[in-house]
């Protein structure tokens, strides 16, 4: 005889889990979207407001701003376990704002139309890869490890090209960069989905959603920068 009570209970639990997972992922994407919005506002403000523009591009302060996000990211991920929710949120927003100031130089190199077009293309690619990572039943761990190693190789190649200044190597690293970050978006999304098992509605769960949003934000920004090398139209 079929135990319908047990079946209904299991179905109810699965439904509750699915709804909780959707809320968790929505929170992650909302954090990420707000960070991207803050980045855009910071970039536009830096270019548009004369005192900030002068500070960024005509003083040594701009160099500090350029490297500050790297320090914040290292501190965030290395010290994440020890920091509270408020600190994690503040660091994320500060990082997004400083990144916007750092990337404002793109408006001096590329046309606004091509920047907007690349952003929407990047958003579409990100959405497709994140959806794949969320919905696939395939374990992406091995693929993620491959792309993580590819990222290390990409960093090394980029550093080498600072001295070689090879256009061919630059083209190759840009193309590889697009592929690597497309793969990382899918892998990171799957990891974030699995993080829900240990995330609750307490502060730990809130912190994990911030870290997840930070990770996807970094994937998006890097994919955008590599796409700009191919799709950006330079100003005359």
Swiss-Prot record:
The chain crosses the membrane at residues 32-52, 61-81, 90-110, 115-135, 144-164, 167-187, 208-228. The keyword Transmembrane applies. Disulfide bonds: none annotated. It is a multi-pass membrane protein. Its main location: membrane. It is found in: Cell membrane. InterPro entries: Bax_inhibitor_1-related (IPR006214). One of its GO terms (cellular component) is plasma membrane. Pfam families: Bax1-I. It comes from the Bacteria. Keywords: Cell membrane, Membrane, Transmembrane, Transmembrane helix. Belongs to the BI1 family. This is Uncharacterized protein RP147. It comes from Rickettsia prowazekii (strain Madrid E). The lineage of its organism: Bacteria, Pseudomonadati, Pseudomonadota, Alphaproteobacteria, Rickettsiales.
């Amino acid at each position: 005889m079929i135990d319908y009570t047990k079946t209904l209970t299991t179905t109810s639990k699965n439904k509750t889990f699915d709804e909780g997972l959707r809320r968790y992922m929505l929170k992650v994407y909302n954090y990420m979207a707000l960070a991207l919005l803050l980045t855009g506002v910071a970039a536009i403000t830096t270019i548009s407001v004369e005192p900030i523009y002068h500070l960024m591009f005509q003083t040594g302060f701009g160099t500090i701003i350029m490297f500050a996000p790297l320090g914040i990211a290292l501190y965030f991920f290395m010290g994440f376990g020890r920091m509270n929710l408020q600190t994690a949120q503040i660091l994320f927003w500060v990082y997004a704002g400083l990144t916007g100031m750092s990337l404002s130089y793109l408006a001096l190199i590329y046309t606004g139309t091509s920047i907007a077009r690349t952003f929407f293309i990047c958003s579409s690619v990100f959405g497709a890869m994140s959806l794949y990572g969320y919905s696939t039943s395939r374990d992406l761990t091995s693929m993620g490890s491959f792309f993580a190693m590819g990222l290390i190789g990409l960093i090394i190649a980029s550093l080498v090209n600072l001295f070689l200044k090879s256009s061919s190597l630059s083209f190759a690293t840009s193309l590889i960069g697009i592929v690597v970050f497309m793969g990382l978006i899918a892998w990171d999304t799957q990891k974030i989905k699995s993080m829900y098992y240990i995330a609750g509605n307490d502060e730990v769960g809130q912190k994990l959603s911030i870290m997840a949003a930070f990770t996807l934000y970094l994937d998006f920004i890097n994919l955008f920068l590599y796409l700009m090398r191919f799709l950006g139209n330079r100003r005359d």
